[in-house]
Amino acid sequence: MTLRNSSSVTEFILVGLSEQPELQLPLFLLFLGIYVFTVVGNLGLITLIGINPSLHTPMYFFLFNLSFIDLCYSCVFTPKMLNDFVSESIISYVGCMTQLFFFCFFVNSECYVLVSMAYDRYVAICNPLLYMVTMSPRVCFLLMFGSYVVGFAGAMAHTGSMLRLTFCDSNVIDHYLCDVLPLLQLSCTSTHVSELVFFIVVGVITMLSSISIVISYALILSNILCIPSAEGRSKAFSTWGSHIIAVALFFGSGTFTYLTTSFPGSMNHGRFASVFYTNVVPMLNPSIYSLRNKDDKLALGKTLKRVLF
């Protein structure tokens, strides 16, 4: 079955963040600034890790992938979002499904990249003598490969459940991107199976990743509290603290968004709440990790010296 046959709608209209004309330019400038910071921050961190052999460690391998994912999923919808502020907000059916797939792929993958990073911190703090043996290149590769496989499977499930729906009455998406819940509201056929797929996939991915991270955190915290010296505890907390902040921002804002949009008539609130985890979190992650890390600052200093001198 072709995409055209699966739906009588050939294009969608994205409502965007606001329908007030006087807000379009300020919002365009605001999100352009956020997008520039996101691209520069994540691309800069990717480059810094790539060209500095001293940063070729398991922790920075995971951080490299986190920055890559943040950069990619921000690029999936932000350019279209910026264009919609200054022109007609139309996206084709194929374009909408493509955007949905890649958005779900990168968001789902990030959940398990954060799990891998939590496991990495657990091994580093709780079993430091076995760290390089446990976190071998093969293990790191398998953890990342598994993260992307989970992301791909989740994206296929979400997109496949949308492709089976028929959109015939309305083509106005009450959002600034093609997401599952706003699309479900437009279907003129039964959405029972698609809703079931959505809640199973989101529930499994969120619950498994959250439980894994919480267990890692509990073990890390119990180990840190057993460190006799205040200096040792402070160092352990500093390496662990940035990851806590990133995880709390990502899972907290994402969970709040989907809980908000699950209630009838609350899509408008969810639209604004989703800005935080789709736009703000990818912008903040490079700062959260690099500004608190001495290795990053040292590597940046060496890189700037090589470039300038």
Swiss-Prot record:
Glycosylation sites noted in the Swiss-Prot or TrEMBL record: 5
Any one biological process term the GO annotation gives: G protein-coupled receptor signaling pathway
SUPFAM superfamilies in the cross-refs: Family A G protein-coupled receptor-like
GO cellular component terms, A-Z: plasma membrane
Name this protein carries in UniProt: Olfactory receptor 8B4
Annotated localization: Cell membrane
Gene giving rise to this polypeptide: OR8B4
Pfam families the UniProt entry points to: 7tm_4
Purpose: Odorant receptor.
Disulfide topology: 96-188
Membrane-crossing segments per the record: 26-46, 55-75, 99-119, 139-159, 197-216, 237-257, 271-291
Main location (coarse class): membrane
Keywords: Cell membrane, Disulfide bond, G-protein coupled receptor, Glycoprotein, Membrane, Olfaction, Receptor, Sensory transduction, Transducer, Transmembrane, Transmembrane helix
CDD domains hit by this protein: 7tmA_OR8B-like
Family: Belongs to the G-protein coupled receptor 1 family.
Membrane topology value: Multi-pass membrane protein
Stretches assigned to the Cytoplasmic side: 47-54, 120-138, 217-236, 292-309
Molecular function GO labels: G protein-coupled receptor activity; odorant binding; olfactory receptor activity
Residue intervals on the Extracellular side: 1-25, 76-98, 160-196, 258-270
